[in-house]
From Swiss-Prot:
Gene from which the chain derives: GST1
Domain GST C-terminal as annotated: residue spans: 81-206
Protein name: Glutathione S-transferase 1
Domain GST N-terminal: 2-79
Keywords of the record: Transferase
Keyword Glycoprotein part of the UniProt annotation: no
One GO cellular component term noted in the UniProt record for this chain: brush border
Organism: Ascaris suum
Family annotation (Gene3D superfamilies): 1.20.1050.10, Glutaredoxin (3.40.30.10)
Length: 206
């Protein structure tokens, strides 16, 4: 079995998807949580000056989505056929667009930037939500299961549900009117390995 080391800050953020994949697969890994003050020294040594980083027997992989895809395929959480794998990638690429549109709102709500919270909710969060959540619901309905693609959980389900749950904790009515997505999130978070990790993981604001 390869030796895995995941390096990210002591928050959920872009590192949590990989942690969830490891826990769902039941694969041991080193969860290296970097202190903010240690980041400037490490940053120039990373491929793109960003975290997370995954080390596999010492070989480094950067970029969160690349890490998710690699781990998903390694652990059988990427779809059962080439077409399912491609559909998983497609849905997650759309979800990344959604998260990119929400980023200005997150930076204000989380206190990284000053701004009018009500304004960013109205002008950024609500339009992005109303544009993208129906697309996710469409894929969920098309699958005919409790997952976005196929009949079993994929890495994209793990990342998407955790991100949406985080947004719902930040904006309580974020999923209002989207009962199907709420049930989807609840189902994935009740998977035994995921439920155990959520109960045990360090409590962080995001």
């Amino acid at each position: 079995m390869p030796q895995y080391k995941l390096t990210y800050f002591d928050i959920r953020g872009l590192g949590e998807g990989a942690r969830l994949i490891f826990h769902q697969a039941g694969v041991k890994f080193e969860d290296n949580r970097l202190k903010r003050e240690d980041w400037p020294a490490l940053k120039p040594k990373t491929p793109f000056g960003q975290l997370p980083l995954l080390e596999v027997d010492g070989e480094v992989l950067a970029q969160s989505a690349a890490i998710y895809r690699y781990l998903g395929r390694q652990f059988g959480l990427a779809g059962k056929t080439p077409m399912e794998e491609a559909q998983v990638d497609s849905i997650f690429d759309q979800f990344k667009d959604f998260m990119a549109e929400l980023r200005p709102c997150f930076r204000v709500l989380a206190g990284f930037e000053e701004g009018d919270k009500e304004k960013v909710l109205k002008e950024v969060a609500v339009p992005a939500r109303d544009k993208h959540l129906p697309l996710l619901e469409k894929f969920l309905a098309k699958s005919g299961s409790e997952y976005m693609v196929g009949k079993s959980v994929t890495w994209a389900d793990l990342v998407i549900t955790d991100s949406l749950a985080s947004w719902e904790s930040l904006i309580p009515d974020f999923l209002s009117g989207h009962l199907q997505l709420k049930k989807y999130i609840e189902h994935v978070r009740e998977l035994p390995n995921i439920k155990k990790w959520i109960a045990e993981r360090p409590k962080t604001p995001y």
